[in-house]
Curated annotation (Swiss-Prot):
Family: Belongs to the endoribonuclease YbeY family.
NCBIfam families registered for this protein in UniProt: rRNA maturation RNase YbeY (TIGR00043)
Residues involved in Zn(2+) binding: H111, H115, H121
Cellular localization per UniProt: Cytoplasm
Protein name, UniProt field: Endoribonuclease YbeY
Molecular function GO terms recorded: metalloendopeptidase activity; RNA endonuclease activity; zinc ion binding
Domain of life of the organism encoding this protein: Bacteria
Amino acid sequence: MLELDIQRATDAATPEDAALRRWCELALRQRSADSEMTIRLVDEAEGRELNHTYRHKDYATNVLSFPADVPDDLLDIPLLGDLVICVAVVEREAAEQGKSLEAHWAHLVIHGCLHLLGYDHIEDEEAEEMESLERELLAELGHPDPYADDETDTITH
């Protein structure tokens, strides 16, 4: 079971809770244990502030992942961590890249969840594994390969 806390810190239109949950559960299905996580949907100012504070980059990015660093045995439900998603960046990227907004949202939520599971894309081999899993999960939802069109269509964080 996934205990999902969704925080909307913006007045912008965002996906419904059920869609966010569906994307998280799909990405996390390889994890058999119950889990807890938070998704915080933010405006550009908060996105920029968090990206600057934690990554020393002075711009808002699409998704930030904050994996929990608490041993599972200390908690009733293992805490995976938090995702922070900047709504304006998601909307802008989808428009610029000619992607449906729903497909881009699904991609970024899945991408962030995979980071919470320990996947990364710093090294080429890690990136290939992570992107392959993203493609597979998005295909299950009926969404196209997010990396197919252009090498610049990569995750910006």
